[in-house]
Amino acid sequence: MSLWKKTLYKSVCLALALLVAVTVFQRSVTPGQFLQDPLPPTLGPPKTGSLVNPNSFWKSSKDVVAPTPTVPRGPQVWDVVTTNCSINVNLTHQPWFQNLEPHFRQFLAYQHCRYFPMLLNHPEKCAGDVYLLVVVKSVITQHDRREVIRQTWGHEWESAGPDRGAVRTLFLLGTASKQEERTHYQQLLAYEDRLYGDILQWDFLDSFFNLTLKEIHFLKWLDIYCPNVPFIFKGDDDVFVNPTNLLEFLSDRQPQENLFVGDVLKHARPIRKKDNKYYIPAVMYSKATYPPYAGGGGFLMSGSLARQLHHACDTLELFPIDDVFLGMCLEVLGVKPTGHEGFKTFGISRVRGSRMNKEPCFYRSMLVVHKLLPAELLAMWDLVHSNLTCSLKFQVL
């Protein structure tokens, strides 16, 4: 090779190396923003046919509901592009505020900050005929849970049965809570999203109190991108779900219903013990009881009600417990959540050591069971879908 060709070759190599270095640097400075146009997902071949069990075990009698009021459509794209949120200085000087625990002070000081930019978005998930949207709350570090869900109950289907559309799955995430880990995990998440194309991510920290942000961000996203999806299942990333039973339950439901069904807690009292995860000081909620709400392990709702919820939630101040906050939004609408025995937020049996919590025949009869580790979920899924012989289905446990 001549000298000028060698020089040209070295120059080209150096330019490529610099381009790669600049790209990596930009990704580390603005995590998530570099993936504006992700590659198409590489999902396995979709299953076809009906998921609905021919038996009508989960078809229950339902209350007559009033027609759903028309809800005005909001913006047609996610319209929050910058994070411009400052502390509420007026609040910080109040004596009652200064007496609160640090995490409550943090929550209240930024309570007015409701919406944040999107880092990862997949509006195409609602394109075409979608019957059920499966939405899973997750955190950036829980890749193993998301992977097991994709292999089991979160697997997408092209048909939910005769005359019914597809089943699509999405995961809801914020950003890593630890600053020193954020860039690393964001790059891993970007790769995961390139593989599967099923992650919605917003630019707020994933924390317990920010679960409420995740609720309102999803409701806003749904209102923008999914105006016609009939039903939504929303759950945690540590639950067992039986999609066949979910679809059987929905088979005689109408999208226009104000449907919100799960493991409903009524007359629950605010916890005042400071060492409890769900402790709420009286200054933040002074009433004796919460409105009825569904435990966050998982619940079903109609798309029409979800769009109403988006607007109802915008009329309320944010509350640090997301399940209770949704109950407050339902109360604004005058809608009462419906309890169902197939949703087990606290396990099939509340006694942790009970053998029922490991019995696959019970899981075959349920809709949602909370909670399982990834290995437990995978093992139970295989058992439930094996040549298992169960004497009967259990309606009330």
UniProtKB/Swiss-Prot annotation:
It is found in: Golgi apparatus membrane. The chain crosses the membrane at residues 7-26. Keywords: Glycoprotein, Glycosyltransferase, Golgi apparatus, Membrane, Signal-anchor, Transferase, Transmembrane, Transmembrane helix. The lineage of its organism: Eukaryota, Metazoa, Chordata, Craniata, Vertebrata. It holds the Pfam family Galactosyl_T. Residues 1-6 are cytoplasmic. One of its GO terms (biological process) is keratan sulfate proteoglycan biosynthetic process. This is UDP-GlcNAc:betaGal beta-1,3-N-acetylglucosaminyltransferase 7. It is a single-pass type II membrane protein. Glycans are attached at residues 84, 90, 210, 387. It is an enzyme of class 2 (transferase). Pathway: Protein modification; protein glycosylation. The keyword Metal-binding does not apply. Its main location: Golgi.
